């Protein structure tokens, strides 16, 4: 059980206290923790369970007299505190509870001796009480160890308490016993704040004692807390309560100074301040005690930078001791400043922002008109110069804000001295709260003075040059305000006490962010504060601009490359041929006028060249209007000569290889390919025809005539009366074919073979060659054979002729002509079918 652990140190407490606890087991006290003990931070007892409530009543009986005193103090505090302040606090509770829990862990290390504060949250929520009770038990154990040193004899009596008071009980009695020990000495705990003051600096963590003194002295600080809840209420209440407002205003003004410290200090201070405010209200005003936030001062110490921001050195040095005991008033002022940073600071900044924005636009327009150059190089130089100026201006801003805060603090040193005399812990608390109040009052007066003459407050120009969001400026103001509250102001005061200097110092810091152009324009538009503040920056800017303008004046547009002479001439001819021709003529004539001899030759040649030859033309051969003037002719001739020269030069110039893609070579088959042109027609030579000359045989006519005469035998024709003139040839053929069965057949066949072996000879050479082909011996044989065997053939041939001669003599003449015509086919048939020798024999025999 967590409650069992604190029992052992509690047993070591004085026996007199334990006896009193035994006597007072169930008195009327349980009603008190509901109403008053919540306010009586020292005497209130936590009731984590129902058993605890019974034990608390037993513990509180011996404390009746000190409780009455505490009740009186609580009534006085309630009178001082305004009732409306209390309700807004619970509204804040949702956000602050989380922060309070964070601070409780930090506070436990510093709060060994005062268990009364953790008792407060018991009335609000038992769930929270259970969580807090564990932390409280740890605190009580630490507290009891110190008590044991003071009263070792009391340890024996607490052993009996173990029997009566079981695990949860010892936490409750331990706290009132420690207070009873103080009360036995001289009721020091009962006005818990007054008597326990010396113990605090030793233990460095009991905000309860510190809370009462600043509350009695700084009663107006308490109502300032609700002001932070709503920005509207803050603005109205600040006007009514000047003491509280300046703390917020001063802190707001101080917050603008340090940008690096802004986010870190704001988060930490907001948590710490919210916790401290709740502590003060719970202990003093609220009937609804919150979780124990005994010493929020530990939380106010500069924690490790949450967002990489670093507190200034004076903040870090002063925050160590001050953080342990920051009073309620200081926390309230810080909360007001933090919450009001958005409202009050923005109220001051926004009108200036509107003015500055307008002025910047006007200045930019003027500068743009004056400055035609818009080169990227100028922009780069400007950004570099801006960065350098921004760093310097940030330093100046920090120094100026510090000096302003110091000057304000120097004006009201009385409050600081009184607080310092009260004690080390109170000095730290008073510096935070009272100094903030004094600053707020002084700044209200100063701001009223500033608003009338200077239209632009020093804060206004800071943002507009970069046109950064208002939230950033407000955060800067809050940071500077927090820094100023924690600073030891005395050594800084003599540096720059006057408000005018502070304003002038603040104003130049503002233009540092914008570009150099904008800064100068702002200075020109707002001459009064800015001009004296930054002569160096302006001189540097002006010198830089002059150098940039001289060096960086816009270069003339790049000249186009000269076209080649041919291209230029061609373009001139296209666009303005008349001007081009006249210019060429003028140039040619002007350059060559002194050479009179050359010109004469050229004119003569040009005139003569107009005609077919170079002779003098006759009159009327040409139109005199067409004759060119001598100068023009000279120019044209010279231009022609130029063209000829150029053409000759180009012709003689080596032909350049056409540039193709490099590194790619054609394959050898393609590169070395040879194209051969072959005609489609094949030429063939040969003898188309030949001529042979031979003697004509005149005997043929005689043969035909004789053959017709010899063949006049009508016998065969009588049998073949059917054949007409047309059928003579057919009859002859049939007869010749019908009679192959002659006994001389073998010889005839032999002859036929011979004849067939040489048929072409008969065709080509003609029928006249039969005499040559057939030997005389064969002819004689055939004559004999005809007489013997071939009588029928002769008869047939003779019959053809005889039938014709039966007609008249005229018909005989015609028949002779017909036979002449029929002679050739008869011989042809003989050659093809029958041995031609037979016919030849007949022919030879007949003459």
From Swiss-Prot:
A GO cellular component entry from the record: actin cortical patch
Biased composition (Basic residues): 656-667
Name by which UniProt lists this protein: Altered inheritance of mitochondria protein 21
Keyword Transcription part of the UniProt annotation: no
Alphabetized UniProt keyword annotations: Cytoplasm, Cytoskeleton
Function: Involved in mitochondrial migration along actin filaments.
Cell compartments where the protein resides: Cytoplasm, Cytoskeleton, Actin patch
Organism: Candida albicans (strain WO-1)
